[in-house]
Amino acid sequence: MLTLYGTELSSRLLLGTARYPSPAILAEAVRRSKTEIVTVSLRRETAGGKAGGAFFELIRDLGVRVLPNTAGCHSVKEAALTAKMAREVFRTNWIKLELIGHQDTLQPDVFQLVEAARILTEDGFEVFPYTTEDLVVGEHLLGAGCKVLMPWCAPIGSAMGPQNIPGLRAMRAEFPDLPLIVDAGIGRPSHAATVMELGFDAVLLNTAVASAADPAAMAEAFANAIDAGHGGYLAGLLEPRDMAVPSTPVIGKGVFA
């Protein structure tokens, strides 16, 4: 089981809700992924007026837990205001905290991120911070009250997959008992399996599913890959070797002079 802020979950896949071809396809993707948490951008959906209301109704009908985010925010003040609005709309203290520092890479502004996390935690929020794999930043986020970290593995929407596996591995080693969710940059089910094999607890996806030729089928493929990667990690993966090692035993074989 995955436990996030005291909530036990069976699925290790968190699914974003943006950019799907239609609400019906989104709903089918959520169902086939078996996710229990979807992320929602309050800023985008409230701007949709009546369409936004229909979207919220769809999410409620799916029976999944909502993790609102502060996507598009560039300042502590902006993120805090968005988080408070999300709490009123969705009636949850959960917030995925995003504070973008660079427009081209969508890299998080980790300095403002720590400040915002502290402010929101003190206001009763349970913060899921979108961050980098930097260990020092991670320590500061824990000091600010976060009990989950969400490091990227590549820029948002890039589909490049994990770009710094040693850094991700170091993060897992540094925070062995903390829930770590890889967020951003996953493009293929194999990418998701790779980070789960490193010992990460879950993966958050959006573009890789929503922009697929068949989003619902891709959601199911990712769910299977995540389960496979996690299962492999628990089973104990064979470490790579520089030289060959015979897999066939030689005991009992005849010796020819």
From Swiss-Prot:
It comes from the Bacteria. GO terms for biological process: thiamine diphosphate biosynthetic process. Keywords: Cytoplasm, Schiff base, Thiamine biosynthesis, Transferase. One of its GO terms (molecular function) is thiazole synthase activity. Coiled coil: none annotated. InterPro entries: Aldolase_TIM, Thiazole_synthase_ThiG, ThiG. Pathway: Cofactor biosynthesis; thiamine diphosphate biosynthesis. The keyword Cytoplasm applies. The active site is at K96 (schiff-base intermediate with dxp). It catalyses: [ThiS sulfur-carrier protein]-C-terminal-Gly-aminoethanethioate + 2-iminoacetate + 1-deoxy-D-xylulose 5-phosphate = [ThiS sulfur-carrier protein]-C-terminal Gly-Gly + 2-[(2R,5Z)-2-carboxy-4-methylthiazol-5(2H)-ylidene]ethyl phosphate + 2 H2O + H(+). 1-deoxy-D-xylulose 5-phosphate binds at G157, A184, G185, N206, T207. The keyword Transferase applies. It is found in: Cytoplasm. Pfam families: ThiG. Its EC number is 2.8.1.10. Catalyzes the rearrangement of 1-deoxy-D-xylulose 5-phosphate (DXP) to produce the thiazole phosphate moiety of thiamine. Sulfur is provided by the thiocarboxylate moiety of the carrier protein ThiS. In vitro, sulfur can be provided by H(2)S. Belongs to the ThiG family. This is Thiazole synthase. The gene is thiG.
